A protein has these predicted regions:
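Cytosolic ends of transmembrane helices, especially the final helix of ABC transmembrane type-1 domains
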Residues: 1-28
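An intracellular "coupling" helix at the cytosolic face of ABC transporter transmembrane type-1 domains
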Residues: 14-17, 31-34, 61-66
Length: 294
């Protein structure tokens, strides 16, 4: 006689899950349409002009809700080819700043320019084309290794794919697979987290965009794998402007500029040595990490 009760309880749980999913779906459908940008004729990299990667933040302000700013007045000038690290506690605004740079959200005030061109004056797709991303949460879709790496770059050659894999130290592993570069992968493939991140780095290298976003790319792997990934990162960042978001401060000592954020504001900036010498928030954060490691 308990079976009907169990079935009723199971049905009730399913209804609860459906209600939660429906709320998210309808919330998405009710979002306002994005602005029509078909009238924007300016393009980054148009007329054969290569995008160098100079980035200028000028008095940027942003809040997810009106009247509740989380980034109050952010300004920074980044030269082409520089490596910029953004550090700070959880909720400081690090990832939000990168999302604004790529125009995933519109800023409330100020401006963001790439090579002197305000990103608001060009279509979003054109802004997105200037970036490659390597995220902590890597993804692999069902397809061959070759297809996974070439995903972001239509028309890429086999040689470019293999050269990228050699540069990140993944070529030997791929050739040990049953079908090499033609081995079919999916989310359940027996790739380690580190191998997935190396594949993502190879994908970004093939894309060859002038600006890189490296978000928490080494925070979930062991020390040896982190070293391999760091070498691949170093190869990837050569000649490109890069923004690195990391909690492991040991990985960004060589950054040209470190922006220390807290509560949406840049409270310190400088090189690793300059910030340590200043003995401020960054120095406390850095020393606390190594005290925990000891």
């Amino acid at each position: 006689f308990t079976q009907p009760l169990s079935q009723f309880a199971q049905a009730f749980q399913n209804l609860q899950r459906c209600a939660a999913a429906a709320e998210r779906v309808f919330g998405f459908l009710e979002e306002p349409e994005m602005e029509d940008e078909s009238g924007k004729s300016a393009l980054l990299g148009a007329n054969g002009h290569e995008v160098k990667g100079d980035v200028e933040f000028s008095h940027v302000q942003f809040g997810y809700e009106p009247g509740k700013p989380i980034i109050h007045d952010f300004s920074a000038s980044v030269k082409a080819g520089q490596k910029v690290a953004i550090v700070g506690p959880t909720g400081a605004g690090k990832t939000t700043m990168v999302n604004l740079l790529m125009r995933f959200y519109e800023i409330s005030g100020g401006s963001i320019a790439i090579d002197g061109v305000d990103t608001k004056s060009v279509p979003r797709w054109n802004v997105h084309d200037q970036f490659s991303m390597v995220l902590q949460d890597t993804w692999v879709f069902r397809g061959t290794v070759r297809e996974n790496i070439a995903y972001s770059k239509p028309g890429v050659t086999n040689k470019q794919i293999e050269d990228a894999c050699k540069a990140v130290g993944l070529d030997h592993f791929i050739r040990s697979l049953p079908d090499g570069y033609d081995t079919v992968l999916d989310d359940k493939s027996s790739l380690s987290q580190g191998q997935k991140q190396l594949l993502t780095i190879a994908r970004a290298m093939v894309q060859d965009a002038p600006i890189l976003i490296l978000d928490e790319a080494t925070s979930s792997v062991d020390t040896r794998t982190e070293e391999l990934i760091q070498k691949a990162m170093d190869a990837l960042t050569v000649g490109r402007t890069s923004f690195v978001i990391a909690h492991r401060l040991s990985t960004i000592r060589d950054a040209d500029m470190i922006l220390v954020m807290n509560h949406g504001d840049v409270i310190e900036r400088g090189t690793h040595d300059e910030l340590l010498a200043a003995g401020g928030f960054y120095a406390d954060l850095y020393n606390s990490q190594f005290a925990l490691a000891d």
